[in-house]
Amino acid sequence: MLTHWNNLLNTDCIVVDVGPHTIYPIFKNGSSSLMSVADKTYVNKQITECNNIDIIIRDPETRFVAGLNEYCQQNNLDIEDTWELVYEGKLINRHFAPQWLWLLHLYKFYKGTVVLKSFKSLTKYCSVRKNKSVKKIDVALINNFVEIDYKLMDHINETTDLETLIRKYKNVLS
């Protein structure tokens, strides 16, 4: 299942410091806002310097719908036609890629402690909301885009080892 995600997994991985917090920005989870207020940026191997990374996790349904809408808006595409391509496995994009995929991406460079935070906690790190979508067209969920993300919601505010989290759900990915 992970093979078709390789193009996304092979992009630069970025972690930022915002004040005293180190955060892994995920697309459609406040990443533009976090990047705009970042004091320091770590890329790929520099991420090993980090300790205790916060990761904002958004409600999977809300994020999938917002991400697909954002992608269609940016590319001037019809949402229903685009949804079909995603459903058929012919289209992937970081805006609606599962959040667990983003954790795998981080895991390439970081094996330490993480704290999953709710999307509501974004205001703790920044007051700016960049790229907030206004108009959203509802679409049906695609199970393999949200299944593990719903399980991640059970770990909000838990401090855990990223490796432990990855191992816990790796069988679901197979």
Label each region the model flagged:
Residues 1-5:
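Extended, non-globular or repeat-rich regions with surface exposure
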Residues 6-14, 44-57, 61-164, 168, ...:
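PAPS-dependent sulfotransferase catalytic domain
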Residues 13-25:
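Extended, structured, electrostatic nucleic-acid-contact surfaces
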Residues 25-37, 58-62:
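Catalytic nucleophile-elbow at a beta strand-turn-alpha helix junction centered on a G-D-S/GDSL motif
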Residues 27-31, 42, 49:
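Short, solvent-exposed loop/edge-beta patches enriched in aromatic
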Residues 37-38, 156:
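Hydrophobic residues on the short alpha-helix immediately C-terminal to a glycine-rich phosphate/catalytic loop
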